[in-house]
């Protein structure tokens, strides 16, 4: 492809893949945290309500308790604020849903509100970078509450108070590990970066490019974690400083400095096992590098409302995704109604679950959702006689399914859906029992309708801004490369060199991520492949020229 074809209007349709859709991957390194937190946060208020004879109210407490699956990678200093905002956001959606349910019997209006809430949840969670499961849990709870039978306006404050109580339990559960391991999230984030650097140091030439990208992304994520971590005591401050030194050392591997993979992996193991933080060999000017990188990243990363508004500015790639979610969720709900489903919340949730960064990922997620839901409905049918034997059995089943969901979701979405489907159906049963056969049939119909509507919306609402995002990322990469080259001719100040390396590595990650997203759009103009390849090559060369220990002669070469 010539450079002239970059701006050509021609488009081509990319095939949607089937290979590897159902492949089982590795478990997440901290899967057990959410897998234990979720059932505990649900079980405590549910068992209290069971003892009081009001298990029917557990649907409302579960709205807050489900927030316990979030924020397990956040440092505790920021986790407290993050969880409070997430719980309030959950309750805001529940409040809108309950008021709507109490104010109108029109299923069409309820579906429209559910679709708008789904779009808002998806957009805000992506903008805030909450991480998995993003806005989907908020959408599930709000959509379920929209179809709660016999809701009255007078009961809404009490039901929201129950949700707040469940949220308080979730907050305590997610903060409790900080009493034992207060720097656990920071250690885990840096360990991931060191493990990635170890793989890069031992990578074969044909796998070095992907390993370099993965390492740079892990380092980037670890820096974000450290910048949100508190250091209120001298001991915590000293530990954080050592963690920062390890990150700087991992960054030199990305820049091309050879290292021992075994040593890097050993340092990562020490961090995970709560041993003293390793101390890499000191280098001249390292303190200046640390100060430069920390100051540069702190200035470049807007937080709170300012960061949220920046992510949602006009031209944001999140806006087409929001339009897709609103359109697909509404189509799914209304189609389900037309097919005779009385409470089509599951179709709305399914459509919302399908939407990913591009249509290729959405296609994969749709197939995984369909397969997982079908198997999950079979499991629900098997469990039904047990769960209807009594309230205690119902609560125990939900807790067990929550554990299995969080233990398997990271391995493959379809596998997690096998457990999340019966869990979600049983949680709705807390409010009122429904005929089992009809419930299973409607949920399977809703699944098919939701997947179809979601994929149709992806095809109709195109994300043409994906290619524009590549152009913006390339412009940042070109600027970072030029700045790095300007420092490469002599003996730059270590702090300046470290800042330039860090900016350049982050810019390379952004370009590759933008290309991956745009490449997954099936109806897309020609991508600037030659320009991307040239910019990445120049960026990697400039990054290598700034590797610590290289003199002017080696840089010039």
Which residues are covered by each model-predicted region?
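Cytosolic regulatory and coupling regions of membrane transport/channel systems
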Residues: 1-43, 151, 155-160, 170-342, ...
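Pore- and pathway-forming membrane helices of multi-pass small-molecule/ion transporters and channels
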Residues: 10-20, 35-46, 50, 54-76, ...
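Hydrophobic alpha-helical segments that drive targeting, anchoring, or assembly
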Residues: 69-88, 93-100, 104-109, 233-246, ...
